[in-house]
Amino acid sequence: MVRRLQEYYGIEWFPEDGASYPVRVFLMKDIGTIGIDTSGVSLHKRGYREVSGKAPITETLAASLIMLTPWNKDRILVDPFCGSGTFPIEAAMMGANIAPGMHREFQAQNWDNIVSPKLFSRGFEEAESLVDTSVEMDIQGYDIDPQIVKAARENAKRAGVDGLIHFQQRPVHHLSHPKKYGFVITNPPYGERLEEKEDLPALYRDMGKAFAGLDGWSEYVITAYEDAERYIGKKAAKNRKIYNGMMKTYFYMFPGPKPPRRKKMVQPEE
């Protein structure tokens, strides 16, 4: 590549200053694709998660899984294994209409000779104008680890949604809620180490008992633990195989009943 540029421009040396233009080569079987990386840091990194737990789910996968459920901002959402807060934060960002790339930088922002900085500024300004953090939502995140709960709060603050989520230290067997028709969307422990695997049956039993006490709720669980249904105590209506990075996981769907439709108020005739 350097030789070709030397021939084209008729010069022997290029100064190594200014903006970087990373070149990526992608190989798929016998086909190679060469491109310039305009993003820099991988797009699955939103820019808010500086601290994460043991087996974090990527921001993009969390958002995709939420969109696979019927949840919307008018419904309660609880994550009893919230870790660094990815599910609650992504849900709150959706509800507040916060664009996923607002809290990060892109490699091409420094390419003044190719992309005008005004285009990025205009895009960020437009995205900012559409944000609505005044929206009322009931989103809660719980975890047994007080330090990771603290990290989740800090991540939510960086994402601009700390006022929309309630985080608290709480074990899964204390999970309860007085209201009906809520959602649990969660990424519980998988048991990556042998000693952790021994604890999984009891943990998933506790989760199943907690689910049984939630009246009319829907539960969605992503896990690599293949005995999840057995110990949760019920069969999923649907089970999707999904890769979290290189790890094969399962997205178990336990949909609950739909809430009754609200009756429209009829105005009396004058």
Would you name each region that the model predicts?
Residues 1-59, 66, 267-270:
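Non-catalytic, mostly N-terminal accessory regions of nucleic-acid modification and defense proteins
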Residues 2-6, 153, 208:
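Generic solvent-exposed, charged/amphipathic alpha-helical segments
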Residues 22, 31-33, 74-77, 138, ...:
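Beta-sheet entry/capping signal
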Residues 28, 81-85, 244-247:
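A short acidic Gly-Thr/Ser loop motif
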Residues 37-38, 46, 92-93, 232-234:
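Short acidic, glycine/serine/threonine-rich loops at helix termini
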Residues 57-177, 192-193, 198-199:
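Conserved S-adenosyl-L-methionine
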Residues 168-270:
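C-terminal catalytic and target-recognition region of SAM-dependent MTase-like enzymes
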